[in-house]
């Protein structure tokens, strides 16, 4: 029996979970709406609410915490990104910068008057292949 088990585990290692949630959180901040499975969305909601609370503070320490939690790479380019940068395409590299700026400049100011509950989960039909519960997670309008 596993009483009070609060960790998000779906058969992946902890490093994989951490990276997956960071990538999903970046996508959610960038697009403000993503489609995923219900267990992932419930865990993502916890992370997103914490990030918005950080963004509402809008201090240097809060920005540094957000960069660390989102695993943003400002000065490191992978070999693929380096090839793209030589060709003049920095889209993958600039997404991380725009995510942090959007989090603090737009989303943080949008939810200043709200004390919590910044996201909404809308349930969809189950996925055809494996019958997984699908949903849409999105930020509220204001």
Swiss-Prot record:
GO cellular component terms given for this protein: cytosolic large ribosomal subunit
Top-rank lineage group of the source organism: Bacteria
One GO BP: translation
InterPro entries, per database record: Ribosomal_bL17, Ribosomal_bL17_CS, Ribosomal_bL17_sf
Keyword entries, A-Z: Ribonucleoprotein, Ribosomal protein
Record carries keyword Ribonucleoprotein: yes
Keyword Ribonucleoprotein among record annotations: yes
Any GO MF annotation of the entry: structural constituent of ribosome
Entry similarity comment: Belongs to the bacterial ribosomal protein bL17 family.
NCBIfam families: L17
Subunit structure: Part of the 50S ribosomal subunit. Contacts protein L32.
Protein's name in the database: Large ribosomal subunit protein bL17
UniProt organism field: Chlamydia caviae (strain ATCC VR-813 / DSM 19441 / 03DC25 / GPIC) (Chlamydophila caviae)
Lineage, opening ranks: Bacteria, Pseudomonadati, Chlamydiota, Chlamydiia, Chlamydiales
């Amino acid at each position: 029996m596993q009483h009070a088990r609060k960790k998000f585990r779906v058969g992946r290692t902890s490093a994989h979970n951490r990276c997956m949630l960071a990538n999903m959180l970046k996508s959610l901040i960038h697009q403000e709406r993503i489609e995923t499975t219900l267990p992932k969305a419930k865990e993502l909601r916890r992370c997103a609410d914490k990030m918005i609370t950080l963004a509402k503070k809008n201090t240097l320490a809060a920005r540094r915490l957000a960069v660390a939690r989102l695993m943003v790479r400002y000065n490191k380019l992978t070999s693929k990104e380096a090839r793209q940068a030589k060709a003049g395409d920095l889209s993958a590299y600039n997404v991380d910068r725009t995510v942090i700026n959007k989090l603090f400049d737009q989303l943080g100011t949008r939810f200043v008057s709200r004390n919590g509950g910044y996201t909404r989960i809308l349930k969809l039909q189950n996925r055809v292949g494996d019958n997984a519960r699908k949903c849409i997670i999105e930020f509220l309008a204001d």
